[in-house]
Amino acid sequence: VLTQHEVKIAPSTYYDARKRRPSARQVSDERWKPIVLGCWQRQRRVLGARKLWLRLRREGHDIARCTVERLMRELGIAGVRRGKRTNPVDADPRETRPADLVDRHFARFRTNQLWVADFTYVWSWSGWVYVAFVFDVHSRRILGWRAATRMTTPLVLDCLEMAFWTRRREGVADFAGLTHHTDAGSVYTSIAFTDRLIEEGIDPSVGSVGDAYDNSLAESQIGLYKTELIHHEGPWRNVDQVEAATADWVQWFNTERIHSSIDDLTPIELEQLEYALTEPLEQAG
């Protein structure tokens, strides 16, 4: 090819290049590429270089972050990017809704001291699907979720009951002292929902109307759901498909997805670590 373009090259140079063995870096790259690609695929094809590098290290692979970044470029893979959430809030106009007990100070709460709840819309070929969530603020764990074709108070109540069941299964018998925070949506400020919280000894808390920052942590978590599952794996046929995929994603999110906000642990790992640290203190007391 070079000679056809009148580029002069000595025959010995050409044959030396043909016989040259791959460099150590090339050999190493070919060994790492299937490992990097396989890990990225197992993690739902959503992780960027940093989280993929941390996941590989967790699996026992001694690889540099810069190597992961370079190989991802060569493989043509990348993490997903989050978009902007635009869900409108059907605000309750009543002035008697619960006060905002959080005031955006999410960081001061420990595990099982503050839950936040919110919902999102998912478009399917059969119409809108509404998915509601309850999160533990400190551990980022998804405690409850439900999907339905109508956005109603029973939907968010069912989601709340799932969160109760999750904690009771782990030995929590009393929810006194827990705060449950939402935006000012009418389903969350309904009498039935508020009464259910009070029945369990939970303090209801509601942010101000039209201010996304008042429930920013829940919106951030739902942003991950939309980015890593809904936009990434759609389109969706119906509520049944959304529900099955959400169940799978929630399991992965709680047990495998690492979060930089909790020292690169998974939600379950953080809760187990805190339980292991507090149990000896409780026994000593």
Which residues does each predicted region cover?
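Charged DNA-binding/catalytic regions of mobile-element recombinases
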Residues: V1-G285
